[in-house]
Amino acid sequence: MRKTAVGALVAAEIVSTLGSRMTYLALPWFVLVTTGSPGKMTLVLAVEIAPMAVLGIPSGSLVQRLGARTTMLVSDFARAPLLAAIPLLDATGHLSFGLLLALVALLGCFMPPYFASQRTILPELVGEDERRMSQANSLVEGGTAMAGLIGPALAGVLIPVLGAPNVLYVDAATYLASFLLVLTLVPRQKRRRASAGARASG
């Protein structure tokens, strides 16, 4: 069961990272194509990145309060429709630039909590076995590093073939896939509650 959970977590983090890296290329290209303005493209990039600087530290407290698994689930579940809404609203003629900025800002706000949950969920899942922790950590780091390299390259291949809007739909699907993997195969952890009880009895 634990091996299945770790494998699902590694797969979820790889898929989610792949989607994030594809978005970093597909979203600016989408803005440039739809607005024809490099300035607006730069502004969208700034709005997407800004939450990383502002919410980095508070995200750690959020993970401690909600738990890493819950934070990861909420982050992926929120990012999927937020990202899919961008090309969908554009296709229906309802995407103003102000609304685009709002969606991108919200999308960016869920990035820091997800990254913070990545750092804490593995120890919760694996436990205190240093050998297993090292093996699992190597799998996660290697997989996400590979996804970080493949994501932009894959986006560069898919954008000319599918178009930037459809690539954004693909990116949204990766977040949904990550959500389903964690929801169905990564169990809730009770270690924090148990440790809190041990401290109280001591």
Regions found by a protein language model. Give the residues of each.
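Alpha-helical transmembrane-bundle signature of multi-pass membrane transport and export proteins
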Residues: 1-202
